[in-house]
């Protein structure tokens, strides 16, 4: 695999298990809370791949160090596992559940409601982004029937000031597309 390739579910799980083994060699235990495309791939099977694993993790510096070793070993991007999502996370306001436990690392995913809210405020537009498809999937997964309910859900986690205008416009368009395709 080269550094620009997408990560398939099986590959992500393999690298996370390898990370767990590396943690065990150092007598450490860790936790990883997965967000973004990796959560969509792992927990929801909504798409086959993602470009990286956006997550919060502990112990942070050790997991970073070990993930870099795995990247070198498998010719992955050095930031295949990263915490760049942290700027969009309000850690006090959402629930998460255990997705998978390896011997030395527990993998968690946020509730789909929070994932929808977070993806909505952090959405990227353009052909390289899967955010619009992820948002549409989560709206349908949660069986949301009214646009107003989506905005109310987002406001449970983020203040009105944190919601970009593009979110309002994009969600209106996504919701209309859902209605048009599911009369």
Q: What is the predicted function of each stretch?
A:
Residues 1-183:
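Compositionally biased terminal segments of proteins
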């Amino acid at each position: 695999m080269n550094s620009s390739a997408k990560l398939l579910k099986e590959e992500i799980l393999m690298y996370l298990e390898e990370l767990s083994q590396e943690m065990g060699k150092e007598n450490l235990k860790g936790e990883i809370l997965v967000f973004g495309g990796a959560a969509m791939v792992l927990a929801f099977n909504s798409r086959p791949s993602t470009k990286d694993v956006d997550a919060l993790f502990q112990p942070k510096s050790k997991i970073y160090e070990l993930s870099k070793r795995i990247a070198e070993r498998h010719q992955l991007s050095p930031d295949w596992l990263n915490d760049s999502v942290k700027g969009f996370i309000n850690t006090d306001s959402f629930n998460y559940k255990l997705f998978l436990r390896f011997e030395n690392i527990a993998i968690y995913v946020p509730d789909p409601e929070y994932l929808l809210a977070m993806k909505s405020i952090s959405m990227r537009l353009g052909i390289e982004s899967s955010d619009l498809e992820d948002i549409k999937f989560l709206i349908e997964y949660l069986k949301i029937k009214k646009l107003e309910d989506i905005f109310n859900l987002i406001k449970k986690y983020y203040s009105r000031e944190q919601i970009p205008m593009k979110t309002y416009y994009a969600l209106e368009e996504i919701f209309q597309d859902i209605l048009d395709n599911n009369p």
